[in-house]
Amino acid sequence: MNNIILQVENLEKKFELYLPEKKVFFAFQNINFNLYQGEFFSISGPSGSGKSSLLKCLYRTYKTTKGSIFYRSSRYGIVDFTKLQEQSVLNIRSNEMSYVSQFLNVIPRISALNLVAEPLIRKNIPQGIAIERAKEMLSRLNIPTNLFDSSPLTFSGGEKQRVNIARAVIWNPSLLLLDEPTASLDEKSEKIVKKILVTMKKSGSTLIGIFHNKKLINQISDRVFLFRKEE
């Protein structure tokens, strides 16, 4: 795979619903692309075309119906993510791959500060250092200091998303998946996030993301993959 970090081959995801009769529909079919080390790869396309479902398959939140996702892991070598044992998937998520979803799901009792520091602590960074780095990241993303000890469940949509981003990027994962990370952000916050993502790319991280802002796509992307809605 040389400098290819992710290779997607003939990927398909279908859903089956019973309403009450069985109905089958495809989120996407026959998806093929390579993702190169250090690349910023954007996915664009109309709403409902299956973009978010694709990212969920890449992260193994969803299991695919057909096809392969070959991932070059620093721990396991080249593996087919669609066939990998669950424990190995969890290890890769903890040590190599991060994901910014559209929605932040957290345990109510956990503060924003501890939530953002947790990935560093998991990687054996001393707790005190992890907390300080989390404070710096939250401040950089304009989260008020008086909210650090509060649960993100009480935050606005934009604040929740910035905490979500902070948690995903603070440990500089090898591969970062982004599902519309700037959709709920104002222009100022979007510019800050853009700078963080560009810095990550320069430091060697590989990024694949869904964006609807065409100007932003043109500014940050090395390549753009156009999704078409399945009929």
Task: Please describe what each predicted stretch is.
Residues 59:
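Helix-to-loop junction immediately C-terminal to a conserved catalytic motif
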Residues 68-91:
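ABC ATPase NBD Q-loop/coupling interface
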Residues 110-118:
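Short coil-to-helix segment of the ABC ATPase nucleotide-binding domain corresponding to the Q-loop/switch region
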Residues 129-146:
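Conserved ABC ATPase "signature" region
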Residues 151-155, 159:
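Conserved ABC ATPase signature
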Residues 168-169:
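ABC ATPase C-loop
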Residues 172:
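Conserved catalytic motifs of ABC-family nucleotide-binding domains
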Residues 176-179:
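Catalytic Walker B motif of ABC-type/P-loop ATPase nucleotide-binding domains
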